[in-house]
């Protein structure tokens, strides 16, 4: 049996998703699988997952997770997902909840215990299956202990001796930081509790565990890999990242064009592509249908419509957008906001919708189908993030011919060619400032109004950009090759 790359993740679309992590892990392993890499995924069995939906079945009953003081077990379910095995760790007391990590009261009190258990269960499952993986690929703090377990266990257990690990940081701001007393129950040896290990200002830091002990560390864009080495974006972990800099790689995420592609999008009233003989008539029909669906003024069909999709939190810069709405309304544009998050931002967005009814629509929440229609029906996509490790929605916007206006940070810098370059695919501004954001939007609006041919050329260039997972997969193949495994 060929040894596998095994992804360990707390989310994987379509089985679970709270944001970009779910999207990425729904696409990346599958892309590698289709490139010939033996690949599987281990993820929790959350309460909302229905076994009948994807042919999920019980494959291992009472898998012993390996706490020496407590014979705790879990059940392992399995699904064949497009020819790739996905394993689900099931233990109701930890994962049978309405939400993944928190509810309206805040983070779940036992998150540390939950994801210690998940990481140990993943390792126990692999031991039970009997074939050591080639690469264990962990993602964010929820699986950060996996590289740490591997680091220490392969020193004494021949089963793990030739396995290597990768830790991918999708967002450094979320670290899994917990009280020091919880380290005692995690199963790592005392020597892991150091400044160069899992200890962080007296706390137990699960993401730091992965960074400290993985053989390779990746982030989701080259620019973000550079940014997190300094205090502005390092979130307190710039020290350990500088120590591990030789092992740190920035690999741009991909977009799943099997799902996000206007030429085959099942959620759109009209499909279209960059080379359609009717030009962008299909996109214009999508715009008219979206205005009707959301109760916006029909005359906006002849004015720029600006779309925002994202969490209504400071990181995404929603406050910058809300600050400048009155100025945007002076330019007779439409604005659509889709997302949820900070209650104050939600309330403010809804208040603005009342003030500018017919020209601004705010939908608190998220539905996948509406997100697709907003991408297709908007003329300009807004992404004023204060930081952005990679970002996926701007990649989707490019494919849908909706030039973005975005902050020049992280993956936004790596994916958008800014106007006025002759190869421009969008517009960027230098820092999180409402006036700079407004000026960039007004540049885009002016261009839309006064240079139809140039705007359509920009749309066409945007739609032809290749941010596929096949492209990203080649970079991961090279990374695995550096670890000693050639899957080509």
Curated annotation (Swiss-Prot):
User: Which branch of life, at top level?
Assistant: Bacteria
Task: State if Glycoprotein is listed as a keyword.
Answer: no
What is its pathway? Glycan biosynthesis; glycogen biosynthesis
- Which terms under GO biological process does the entry name? glycogen biosynthetic process
Q: Which residues bind ADP-alpha-D-glucose?
A: 17
Catalytic activity, as annotated: [(1->4)-alpha-D-glucosyl](n) + ADP-alpha-D-glucose = [(1->4)-alpha-D-glucosyl](n+1) + ADP + H(+)
The record's annotation in InterPro entries points to:
GS/SS (IPR011835), Starch_synth_cat_dom (IPR013534)
Key words of the record: Glycogen biosynthesis, Glycosyltransferase, Transferase
**Keyword Transmembrane helix attributed:** no
- Write the Enzyme Commission number(s) for this entry: 2.4.1.21
Pfam families hit by this protein:
Glyco_trans_1_4 (PF13692), Glyco_transf_5 (PF08323)
- Gene Ontology terms, MF aspect: alpha-1,4-glucan glucosyltransferase (ADP-glucose donor) activity; alpha-1,4-glucan glucosyltransferase (UDP-glucose donor) activity
According to its UniProt record, which protein family does this protein belong to?
A: Belongs to the glycosyltransferase 1 family. Bacterial/plant glycogen synthase subfamily.
Q: What does this protein do?
A: Synthesizes alpha-1,4-glucan chains using ADP-glucose.
Its name, as the record gives it, is Glycogen synthase
Per the UniProt record, the source organism is Nitratidesulfovibrio vulgaris (strain DSM 19637 / Miyazaki F) (Desulfovibrio vulgaris)
List the lineage, top down. Bacteria, Pseudomonadati, Thermodesulfobacteriota, Desulfovibrionia, Desulfovibrionales
């Amino acid at each position: 049996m060929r040894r596998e790359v095994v992804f360990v993740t707390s989310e994987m679309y379509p089985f679970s998703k709270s944001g970009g992590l779910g999207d990425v892990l729904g696409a990346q392993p599958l892309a590698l699988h289709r490139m010939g890499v033996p690949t599987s995924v281990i993820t929790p069995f959350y309460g909302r997952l229905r076994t009948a939906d994807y042919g999920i079945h019980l494959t291992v009953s009472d898998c012993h997770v390996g706490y020496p003081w407590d014979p705790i077990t879990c059940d392992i379910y399995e699904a064949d997902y497009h020819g790739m095995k996905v394993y689900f760790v099931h233990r109701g007391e930890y994962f049978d909840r309405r939400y993944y990590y928190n509810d309206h009261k805040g983070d779940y009190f036992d998150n540390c215990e939950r994801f210690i258990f998940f990481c140990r269960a993943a390792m126990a499952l692999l031991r039970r299956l009997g074939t050591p993986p080639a690469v264990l690929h962990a993602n964010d703090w929820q699986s950060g202990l996996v590289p740490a377990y591997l680091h220490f266990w392969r020193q004494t257990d021949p089963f793990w001796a030739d396995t290597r690990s990768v830790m991918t940081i999708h967002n450094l701001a979320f670290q899994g930081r917990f009280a020091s007393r919880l380290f005692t129950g995690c199963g790592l040896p005392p020597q892991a509790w150091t400044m160069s290990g899992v200890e962080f200002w007296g706390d137990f830091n699960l993401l730091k565990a992965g960074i400290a002990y993985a053989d390779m560390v990746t982030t989701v864009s080259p620019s973000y890999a550079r940014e997190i080495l300094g205090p502005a974006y390092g979130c307190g972990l710039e020290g350990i990242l500088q120590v591990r800099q030789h092992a740190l790689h920035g690999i741009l995420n991909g977009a799943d064009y099997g799902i996000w592609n206007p030429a085959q999008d099942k959620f759109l009233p009209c499909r279209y592509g960059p080379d359609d003989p009717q030009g962008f008539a299909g996109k214009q029909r999508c715009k008219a249908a979206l205005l009707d669906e959301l109760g916006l003024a029909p005359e906006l069909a002849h004015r720029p419509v600006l779309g925002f999709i994202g969490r209504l939190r400071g990181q995404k810069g929603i406050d910058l957008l809300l600050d400048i709405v009155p100025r945007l309304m002076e330019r007779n544009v439409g604005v659509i906001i889709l997302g949820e998050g900070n209650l104050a931002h939600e309330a403010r967005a809804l208040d603005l919708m009342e003030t500018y009814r017919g020209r601004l629509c705010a939908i608190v929440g998220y539905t996948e189908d509406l997100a697709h229609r907003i991408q297709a029906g908007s003329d300009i996509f807004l992404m004023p993030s204060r930081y952005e490790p990679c970002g996926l929605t701007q990649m989707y916007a490019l494919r849908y011919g909706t030039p973005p206006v975005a902050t020049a940070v992280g993956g936004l810098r790596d994916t958008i060619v800014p106007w006025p370059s002759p190869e421009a695919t969008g517009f960027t501004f230098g820092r999180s400032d409402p006036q700079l954001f407004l000026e960039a939007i007004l540049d885009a609006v002016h261009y839309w109004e006064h240079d139809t041919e140039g705007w359509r050329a920009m749309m066409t260039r945007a739609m032809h950009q290749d941010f596929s997972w096949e492209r990203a997969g080649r970079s991961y193949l090279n990374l695995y090759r550096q670890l000693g495994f050639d899957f080509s």
